[in-house]
Amino acid sequence: MKRIIYCILVLVIIFNGTGCKKESKPEDNFIKVYDDANGNKHFHPLSITTSESGDGYIVVSAFDSWRIQIMKIDNAGEFQWNYELPSNYVNAVPNLLKINGQNYLVCMDAIGLFTYVLKIDEASQNITQVSSFSDVLYPTYAYNSGQHIYIQNYDRMSFETGIHELSGDLSSITQSGSVNIFTDVEERIVNHITYNNNRIPFFISTTQNQNYIVMNGFYNYSFSMIFLNPDLSFAGVYNGQGFNSGASAISPISGNQFSIARFSYDNLYFNPNVSLSPTTIDITSSISAQGQSELDPGRSVLIKDLVIGGTSYKAYLSSTRSNQLLLSIYETSGGTLVGKKYLGKNIPITASDFIQTEDEGLNILVQAKIMGSIDRIALMKLSKEQLETIID
């Protein structure tokens, strides 16, 4: 990646919003599309996090199906460097692990299908292999709860969804659990990791007090949201209707309260404050939620905490059927919608990830489709002032 395309568009048109209360500096808000020197690669951005050095951000993307690229940008979104991992490392899970300020990547071996844990070495612009787990096939998600580190996977031999807790140094597995799918879903997994059709919304989370782990994956002939005890034994489940419904994203609030997005066939539903029972056996369609007919249920939904004007909110980032983004802001305690903003107008974009910046703005990682068919990594920056106008 040798150059950056700066989209020659007025920001107010790109962001499709109103003016700010105060004049923002040029670096406070922007959109940048990162081009590739070869021009023929298709990129799928996966995750953005702060750099180890604190002077920018690390972006992990897939390209040409399941290959992996790491990119470093500075705080103003300027390209610094990129590194394409050797071809044996594939299928990066869609989030980075941050442990003691350092960034780690979980991925898969292209031939053996087993799991690697890699450390991103910013100084050398390279990666260091930390560990490999030959019995953990098809990794699908990784999560650091602050107390424990987990990897989710699909076992193609036993038709099970597995979850594995790692040691603090990431060198070994301390305990494992699994749930039985009772059917072969390998074709669905392969389509997921090679970006052939829509991605599957795997995730791992916990209740706010970490009494339970929440895992979204295949279970009992369906796509299900499974609650696990701390020893990774089964506690309860919200089953999907086969593979046509289930949870899309979740974010803990307190106790057993969550913000959730769920899908059912061709529709998305949001509930920013709902009580879930970790020991129930139920179906996801029983979770009360409001329909979002303008949104594309086949695209990623992200739910994270977002601080605006000193107050913490729940932010939902989703993709519309018309190839825009929708940023919806809800009160954390009551779940009231306090504002929303549509982003993007001139080029089709899809939500990938977002992260709040040190200056209380928001970096939004997206896939931008240039000239109708060229998939590129792009970054949209909303300033603190722009966020404040959303909740006015």
Feature map (PLM): residue ranges:
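Aromatic (tryptophan-biased) beta-strands that constitute blades/sheets of beta-rich domains
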Residues: K25-H44, Q69, E78-L85, Q125-D135, ...
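Beta-propeller blade signature
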Residues: Q69-G77, T115-Q125, T161-S171, F223-D231, ...
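Hydrophobic strand positions within the blades of repeat-based beta-sheet folds
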Residues: I48, I58-V60, I70, W81, ...
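Blade-level signature of beta-propeller repeat domains, shared across WD40, Kelch, NHL, RCC1
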Residues: T350-D392
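Beta-strand-rich domains and repeat architectures in extracellular enzymes and scaffolds
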Residues: D35-I68
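Repeated scaffold domains used in trafficking and secretory/extracellular systems
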Residues: H42-T50, Y89-K98, S134-Q147, D184-T206, ...
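Bacterial Sec-dependent N-terminal signal peptides
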Residues: M1-L46
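Short glycine/acidic-enriched loop and turn motifs that connect beta-strands
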Residues: F63-R67, D109-F114, D155-E160, F218-S222, ...
